[in-house]
Amino acid sequence: MQQTPLFKNHYFHQLPEFYTALQPKPLHGARLLYHSEGLAAELGLSSDWFTPEQDAVWSGERLLPGMEPLAQVYSGHQFGMWAGQLGDGRGILLGEQQLADGRSMDWHLKGAGLTPYSRMGDGRAVLRSVIREFLASEAMHHLGIPTTRALTIVTSTHPVQREQEEKGAMLMRVAESHVRFGHFEHFYYRREPEKVRQLVEYVIARHWPQWENDERRYELWFGDVVERTARLITHWQAVGFSHGVMNTDNMSILGLTIDYGPYGFLDAYQPNFICNHSDHRGRYAFDNQPAVGLWNLHRLAQALSGLMDTDTLERALARYEPALMQHYGTLMRAKLGLFTASAEDNDVLVGLLRLMQQEGSDYTHTFRLLADSEKQASRAPLRDEFIDRAAFDSWFATYRQRLMQEEQGDEERRRLMNTTNPKFILRNYLAQMAIERAENDDISVLARLHQALCQPFDEQPDKNDLAALPPEWGKHLEISCSS
């Protein structure tokens, strides 16, 4: 029997001045193209919800009982400059689903039409960008990285003009919250400190209830936001993910990866990799992400300055770098197969990264192959991947010495490495192949790629082609903010 999800909309009822209520605007010829069975199961949705009879639900044409749709208002700093009012320009929060375990999940329909915050946009999304966000959300989740999720992809016959005419599409994004740093900035710059306080009290009550009645709740909460942000970015750095548009309106208060635009996973290891071809100065380059995270937290701290004194805010911000270094160290030691911490670990890591940079080695492939090394072997299978064999041999000798300090054997170390270093990541060329087929109503590549990304650490030998290094045409794909 098909059970209707239960919606109870806290944001709608508790923060009436933080949004505009409005209805989604359906696309012509909208139909469900694909969905995440795994997420559907987590949400308690049976397969009956994903039949053609339910297309109107996923396209926003038919609201479920209890839904109260709204577009959120927020502001933000974009590329380091204050951009003023922004808000949901094409997304509508349909409602908050109440799950059996007590959690609440936003259903947010992206591409749902014009809102009061659309500015110069048309309120629409195209199939290309929707598929990219769907795949990235699923990939990041199964890599163990905090992220918003993606439930459904809707395609249509609705033409949308970008650099060329494309198919209009919609994505149902699911997350525990869509509150961003920019929500707080919006009311700070409007000189409405009571609204900032109201929002802080709301997010603490909803997501940090353990501190709701604590006199130090603001400090405890902000300190946790700082640490969540640090942990998120260390995950990005460890897996080789570049977000591309780390504006403050794209920063989740829960420390989730949100707003997948011109993102990219590293192919060749390039610390200064820029995935967004609109980022001419490299503000959001891969190796600059940790610094930008802290810069964004300073902007949030400024917005909270009416609630906490400078010393309290600075104390919380000071937790960022230690948290960043601690979590990065833990993740990178696991990538190297190290169970314990040692003074020379950083030298071992930096030595490998330097070699990879010099040779343009593939980031994911190199770490995955490293697991096949053995303590007692003077040479590793990975050696053949390097041109400068002497340099690799020198590094590998140092690495072997470090492994000798570990009690665990090769098999245990290999298990650690192969559950830390993925075999499958979402390379741009793979996403492009899925997009091109899907634009012609063939979802076979999309489905197969999605399946691989749901088990990124497993061997899946029948999908070895999806773990291949990018072909020449796939090495330099340019991705912009156009979506």
From Swiss-Prot:
<dbReference type="InterPro" id="IPR003846">
    <property type="entry name" value="SelO"/>
</dbReference>
<feature type="binding site">
    <location>
        <position position="250"/>
    </location>
    <ligand>
        <name>Mg(2+)</name>
    </ligand>
</feature>
<keyword id="KW-0808">Transferase</keyword>
<feature type="binding site">
    <location>
        <position position="259"/>
    </location>
    <ligand>
        <name>ATP</name>
    </ligand>
</feature>
<keyword id="KW-0460">Magnesium</keyword>
<keyword id="KW-0547">Nucleotide-binding</keyword>
<keyword id="KW-0548">Nucleotidyltransferase</keyword>
<feature type="binding site">
    <location>
        <position position="180"/>
    </location>
    <ligand>
        <name>ATP</name>
    </ligand>
</feature>
<feature type="binding site">
    <location>
        <position position="259"/>
    </location>
    <ligand>
        <name>Mg(2+)</name>
    </ligand>
</feature>
<dbReference type="GO" id="GO:0005524">
    <property type="term" value="F:ATP binding"/>
</dbReference>
<feature type="binding site">
    <location>
        <position position="110"/>
    </location>
    <ligand>
        <name>ATP</name>
    </ligand>
</feature>
<keyword id="KW-0479">Metal-binding</keyword>
<keyword id="KW-0067">ATP-binding</keyword>
<feature type="binding site">
    <location>
        <position position="89"/>
    </location>
    <ligand>
        <name>ATP</name>
    </ligand>
</feature>
<dbReference type="GO" id="GO:0070733">
    <property type="term" value="F:AMPylase activity"/>
</dbReference>
<protein>
    <recommendedName>
        <fullName>Protein nucleotidyltransferase YdiU</fullName>
        <ecNumber>2.7.7.-</ecNumber>
        <ecNumber>2.7.7.108</ecNumber>
    </recommendedName>
</protein>
<comment type="function">
    <text>Nucleotidyltransferase involved in the post-translational modification of proteins. It can catalyze the addition of adenosine monophosphate (AMP) or uridine monophosphate (UMP) to a protein, resulting in modifications known as AMPylation and UMPylation.</text>
</comment>
<keyword id="KW-0464">Manganese</keyword>
<feature type="binding site">
    <location>
        <position position="122"/>
    </location>
    <ligand>
        <name>ATP</name>
    </ligand>
</feature>
<feature type="binding site">
    <location>
        <position position="87"/>
    </location>
    <ligand>
        <name>ATP</name>
    </ligand>
</feature>
<comment type="similarity">
    <text>Belongs to the SELO family.</text>
</comment>
<feature type="active site" description="Proton acceptor">
    <location>
        <position position="249"/>
    </location>
</feature>
<dbReference type="GO" id="GO:0000287">
    <property type="term" value="F:magnesium ion binding"/>
</dbReference>
<dbReference type="Pfam" id="PF02696">
    <property type="entry name" value="SelO"/>
</dbReference>
<feature type="binding site">
    <location>
        <position position="123"/>
    </location>
    <ligand>
        <name>ATP</name>
    </ligand>
</feature>
<feature type="binding site">
    <location>
        <position position="90"/>
    </location>
    <ligand>
        <name>ATP</name>
    </ligand>
</feature>
<feature type="binding site">
    <location>
        <position position="173"/>
    </location>
    <ligand>
        <name>ATP</name>
    </ligand>
</feature>
